[in-house]
């Protein structure tokens, strides 16, 4: 009963005229930041943090501004991912797998509308989980140590091999290339230089923004130039703006399942929306009964990662609010905002400063309603990107990509590396290698290595720690099954057809 009283008080805080305007501004700015390749929610929140403090906003208003920017970025990241095959951030990579083919088929508006609605329900379910189960889930998340996180990364990487049902070997090879890129730089534990080729610029490793923009944006530009130089016409239709009832009904189960999975992954500190979107995409592909349609414009391939992205983003607030542990990189920045206001995140916040906690929860709900109302009418405007002539679109994408990469370290080396990775991406795409496993392998590789090192450090080098706990065992068994079961089933189906052929 107290929960609902506190929630009503939270709505009283969030629905003051000042905070409603702040939430609206945060949603709009977040959508724009999410739309721009390479920025993402961490940079969006980091940019707004000093502004919130400089404007002397109250603590609850500052937190509402940053939270709405965060959620707005999750909405905005899908736009360039679907329409241009240029993910706004790592979490939007999975959306491009089916969203971009839908846009090429003239269903860009359908993809954007289903992603907006799926994102809304993903956030709604996650916010319900925060309200009902926050303290309980915070304790559950503590059961995940380095060994469990290592097993989770292994499971996520194992799932990458199934992205291309026709040729899983190419998916695994692409993921291995991504893992290899993640090892570039100085080893944090030993100080050994790895694959730097005596270049000072590579000592810090390859930045994610450089990788994702090179592999997706630059390679896409090269493909566009190839089509225009060969006299071919790129398929760039707009089509209808909204999904129909049949398509919506098709995505109900997908959205519900992905929201729940995304929420639980988001609760785990450090897991994040990237892992949530990858796991839910592969889950839906396995459950679909027609996995061949995924990657070719299946609407469920858009609904699953989008519901998971937003559910995970909302779920990441649980460890921050209840334990004082950041659930994601973005909530880590938001914790910095709390310290600026002399607020210590943790269990005491729920009793000592309930107006801030419940005001934030209420603002998350209000922000998602605002974003849905804001984004659906703008779909027509967004899809007009598809009608922009290539002579303007190609240099525009190149300029935005170059600015995004140069902003990381302000070095021309990053621009050269971006182009080199773009050429690599172009060659791999011509050889029908998928880019998503490569980029996700790069993202997961760093987390995989960090948690492996931590686990072995705790156990003094004893490898048994990696499979001692029940959670780690379950995840590793699932990873083995994901790798082994599909080829075994294919062999069984092949042998079962042979007698029929012989009999004929």
Q: Across the structure, where does each feature detected by a protein language model lie?
A:
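Short helix-coil transition sites and intra-membrane helix breaks within transmembrane domains
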Residues: 33-43, 82-93, 125-129, 265-275, ...
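Transmembrane alpha-helix interface/packing and boundary motifs in multi-pass membrane proteins
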Residues: 27-41, 72-85, 160-165, 260-269, ...
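Re-entrant/interfacial helical elements at transmembrane boundaries that shape
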Residues: 41-51, 66, 81-101, 132, ...
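A structural-propensity feature for long, helix-poor, extended segments
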Residues: 70-81, 88, 298-323, 327, ...
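Membrane-embedded alpha-helical modules
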Residues: 113-230, 340-494
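Helix-loop-helix hairpins and the membrane-proximal interhelical loops
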Residues: 1-60, 135, 139-141, 193-298, ...
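Membrane-embedded alpha-helical segments of transport systems
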Residues: 71-76, 117-129, 137, 181, ...
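Membrane-interface alpha-helices at helix entry/exit sites of multi-pass transporters
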Residues: 59-64, 101-118, 289-302, 329-332, ...
